[in-house]
Amino acid sequence: MSQKGSVKKAVLAYSGGLDTSIIVRWLIEEYGCEVIAFAADVGQGKELDGIPEKARQTGASKCYVEDLREEFVRDFVFPMFRANAIYEGRYFLGTSIARPLISKKQMEIALAEEAEAVCHGATGKGNDQIRFELAYYHFNPEIKIIAPWREWDLNSRESLIAYANKHGIPVPVTKKRPWSSDRNLLHISFEGGVLEDPWAEPPEDMYLLSVSPEQAPDKPEYVEIEFRNGDPVSINGESLSPAQLLAHLNELGGKHGIGRADIMENRFVGMKSRGVYETPGGTILEEAHRGVEQITMDREVLNLRDSLIPRYATMVYNGFWFAPEREAMQAMIDETQKTVNGVARVKLYKGHCRVVGRKSETNSLFDPEVATFEADEVYNQADAEGFIRLNALRLRIRSAMQKKHG
């Protein structure tokens, strides 16, 4: 049913890919409204080439292209990595963490353009629709949201490609490579197509950021990453901006085949889906961050922060970045990171990265005089007996009761 007249102007989160290329034309035909395209540069690289021209060719009146790379890494990726947030123990949340920033900027443009509506290209089965729309409502509780995938009858990749061909819309997708991808400075994700068979191995030519571990260099490479207050600030002694630092780690990790993950994850909407991810720089960063934390954080503080990881990661995955509980958790996590100052030395080799050295000039809690296995005068080993007996009390009581009652 036509919606013409209900909206005069809409701002579309535009990627130039299959869905959003078609949505520009569809919005004009279905709603009869002016369409303003917005493309967020969060590290897609050449994927953004020609975006303004493509948007205008398909009917958009304007196209904003905003360079958000530094803000993305500084204000979204780094805070998340202070929490060591990994969803279900595998997914580094590369797509999830980009959506709040894209939505934030999209809403700023909608306000400046006096647009009544915002629009996204997320499907009605996925998580992104939730992530976008929760953020939209955070910034404007009364905003009108248009989600074409929940309205139109173009319900498959094949039908979308046919629609595009019919209307002369160029799209960078062919039937030979039908899977979809989403790329930013933190990762690239792949889903759909051959990946919908959970038994099928991803084709090697799908990967874009990393070489196969089998084809990686035969010689390991070492990298030193410095952290201040839980954030990385330099690589091998060279200070870099947040976006530069992550981009450099992506190059190093990709060269050594680091950061590939093939995951069957649980979507917020209730279904399982398969995603294949490349997160080379993020994988190195998480390992290095852990290394510095281990030498600088108090045991109980570390355990407390780690207990929050599943909840924090799930909030980001489900789209609750702007929720008060995430902000409260972030404040606590950031407090724990004030002592995370130091350097981790990481070994990169054939798909693996591991910390092989860590140090902190200002916040190390490691005391070699206490930890040594050699003779020392700091630690009286006889004291351990009472400590053990006290901690064993509940176990001894339980054992005695079991014997008493058979």
UniProtKB/Swiss-Prot annotation:
InterPro entries: Arginosuc_syn_C, Arginosuc_syn_N, Arginosuc_synth, Arginosuc_synth_CS, Arginosuc_synth_type_1_subfam, AS_cat/multimer_dom_body, Rossmann-like_a/b/a_fold
Domain of life: Bacteria
Binding locations of L-aspartate: T123, N127, D128
Main EC class the enzyme belongs to: ligase
UniProt-listed Pfam families: Arginosuc_syn_C, Arginosuc_synth
Keyword Glycoprotein found: no
Annotated binding of ATP, by residue: A13, Y14, S15, G16, G17, L18, D19, T20, S21, A40, G121
Protein residues bound to L-citrulline: Y91, S96, N127, R131, S180, S189, E265, Y277
EC number per UniProt: 6.3.4.5
GO cellular component: cytoplasm
One biological process term in Gene Ontology: L-arginine biosynthetic process
Catalytic reaction annotation: L-citrulline + L-aspartate + ATP = 2-(N(omega)-L-arginino)succinate + AMP + diphosphate + H(+)
Intrachain disulfide bonds: none
Coiled coil ranges: none
Chief subcellular location: cytoplasm
HAMAP family per the UniProt record, alphabetical: Arg_succ_synth_type1
Oligomeric form and interacting partners: Homotetramer.
The protein, known as: Argininosuccinate synthase
Species of the source: Syntrophotalea carbinolica (strain DSM 2380 / NBRC 103641 / GraBd1) (Pelobacter carbinolicus)
Gene (UniProt): argG
